[in-house]
């Protein structure tokens, strides 16, 4: 895997991981993604930042311009507001912090003469009951490296090479407290401000289109439940057998992915015994639905029609053959009857 692909893969995995960690149907999130390369050959600047609200990109920043640029229509009018200026200052501070952390990690790995990448994801989720969850994670060369634990003000090392940096950072309690203050106070406040700005856009709810399809391959029958064109991306999909939940280990699910038009899509599949398809139901929960939606597989009209036509033709052929056989038998009987009358006449 090339150096450019590693940061992208890391962020794709992190985005899915953070989004999938039990987010309730009506929670909201604010995430900042930082990335940088020590050398230009990785195709990245020394520092670049992207900000997302509920997976909607709203701000971008890089080390060369040193200014925050809006990336969404609903924040264009806030370029000179006090909160936007505070956001710009935060990004400038993170720019400096990122570079210092980058050199620290490289020094602790004795990598000062090589080209490497650093990735960071930090932010918070605010749930419907106003409870919050913060996250602050580092990746080095596309691999998990360190994760901040706000409850204990410690860092969790994802690999043994990160232990030196972990111990070094844990000595700085002032920074740890500042990190926690951001995750538990400043980040939720920023998120609420952004949600107010994006009202009518971020709070829209588009219910999913749900359908169940039927597939047979290598003697295995599979039902696939598809949810299409929904927003936001928070969705729960499960299979029921005779109205009882099926063990999630038996089902194959796909991550929620963007459709390309601002909506999302996902699916969950299940292998079922042939002939028992009607015992299984797909249940979908989404903020755009007033109540859980259920769907079952129904044979398409074309399949039913083809089956009916084939059955009809088969019946007609059978009737035709029976008719021919009946006529042959009658002719034979008639022929035998005529011969019998002729012989009797001669005897008289």
From Swiss-Prot:
Gene Ontology molecular-function annotations: transferrin receptor binding
Signal sequence interval, chain numbering: 1-22
Source organism of this protein record: Rhinoceros unicornis
Topological domain spans for side Extracellular: 23-306
Region of interest: Connecting peptide: 298-306
Family as reported in the entry's similarity comment: Belongs to the MHC class I family.
Entry membrane topology: Single-pass type I membrane protein
Record region (Alpha-2): 115-205
Oligomeric and partner information: Binds TFR through the extracellular domain in a pH-dependent manner.
Region of interest: Alpha-1: 23-114
Organism domain of life: Eukaryota
Name the UniProt record assigns to this protein: Hereditary hemochromatosis protein homolog
Keyword match Membrane: yes
Claim: Magnesium is one of the keywords in the record: no
């Amino acid at each position: 895997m090339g150096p450019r692909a590693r940061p992208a893969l890391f962020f794709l995995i992190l985005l899915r991981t953070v989004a999938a960690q039990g987010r309730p149907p009506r929670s909201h999130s604010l995430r900042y993604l930082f990335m940088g390369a020590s050398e230009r050959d990785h195709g990245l600047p020394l520092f670049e930042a992207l900000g997302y609200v509920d997976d909607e990109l709203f701000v971008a920043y890089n080390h060369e311009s040193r200014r925050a640029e809006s990336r969404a229509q609903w924040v264009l009018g806030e370029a000179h507001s006090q909160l936007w200026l505070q956001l710009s200052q935060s990004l400038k501070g993170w720019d400096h912090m990122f570079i210092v952390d980058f050199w620290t990690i490289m020094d602790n790995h004795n990598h000062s003469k090589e080209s490497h990448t650093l990735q960071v994801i930090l932010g918070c989720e605010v749930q419907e009951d106003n409870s919050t969850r913060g996250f602050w994670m580092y990746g080095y060369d596309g691999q998990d490296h360190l994760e901040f634990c706000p409850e204990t003000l410690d860092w969790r090392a994802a690999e043994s090479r990160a232990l030196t940096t972990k111990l070094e950072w844990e000595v700085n309690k002032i920074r740890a407290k500042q990190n926690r203050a951001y995750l538990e106070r400043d980040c939720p406040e920023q998120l609420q401000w952004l949600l107010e700005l994006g009202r009518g856009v971020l709070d829209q709810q588009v219910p999913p289109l749900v359908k169940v399809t039927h597939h047979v391959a290598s003697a295995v029958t599979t039902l696939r439940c598809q949810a299409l064109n929904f927003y936001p991306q928070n969705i729960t999909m499960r299979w029921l057998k005779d109205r009882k939940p099926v063990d999630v280990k038996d089902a194959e699910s796909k991550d929620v992915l963007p459709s390309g038009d601002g909506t999302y899509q996902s699916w969950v599949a299940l292998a079922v015994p042939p002939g028992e398809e009607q015992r299984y139901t797909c249940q979908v929960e989404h903020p755009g639905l007033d109540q859980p939606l259920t769907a079952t597989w129904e044979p398409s009209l074309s399949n039913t029609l083809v089956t009916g036509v084939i059955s009809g033709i088969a019946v007609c052929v059978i009737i035709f053959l029976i008719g021919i056989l009946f006529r042959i038998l009658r002719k034979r009987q008639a022929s035998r009857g005529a011969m019998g009358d002729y012989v009797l006449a001669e005897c008289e």
